[in-house]
């Protein structure tokens, strides 16, 4: 008898949330749908929500509508990680403004950090060991098929 796997826990960077809302049929949108359908456990922090809300002009909807949508997908939304944890990750990142993303993914006990930020986060794939940093496509193709219960689809 197969032992059920623990749910896949994925921390979302703001870039993926924004792309998923703009294009629900793309890879980022498919991941948001999997979170909504409870096929994977999705996580964001308050700082990620704030970043998404700062970019509502790219999405073309009101800030209120975007916040309502994001909160309906991700629950709970994790608090901002401690400054001590952020400082640990500052030593690794290229842009210190991204340290909170890695700290949040770690404090949320995520298996994966999904991002579209090639310049600052995906470049760290080989350096981070506590979780995997991947693109939506990498996560869908290489990881999710092992975790999804297709009977819920």
Residue ranges of each PLM-predicted region?
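Metal-dependent nucleic-acid phosphoesterase active-site entry motif
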Residues: 1-25
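PIN/NYN-family metal-dependent endoribonuclease catalytic core
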Residues: 11-12, 22, 27-58
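Short amphipathic alpha-helical segments and helix-helix/interface helices
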Residues: 29-33, 67, 101-102
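Acidic, PIN/NYN-like endoribonuclease modules and their adjacent C-terminal/linker elements
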Residues: 49, 111, 118-153
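Extended, non-globular alpha-helical segments
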Residues: 49-74, 142-153
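Active-site neighborhoods of divalent-metal-dependent phosphate/nucleic-acid chemistry enzymes
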Residues: 76-122
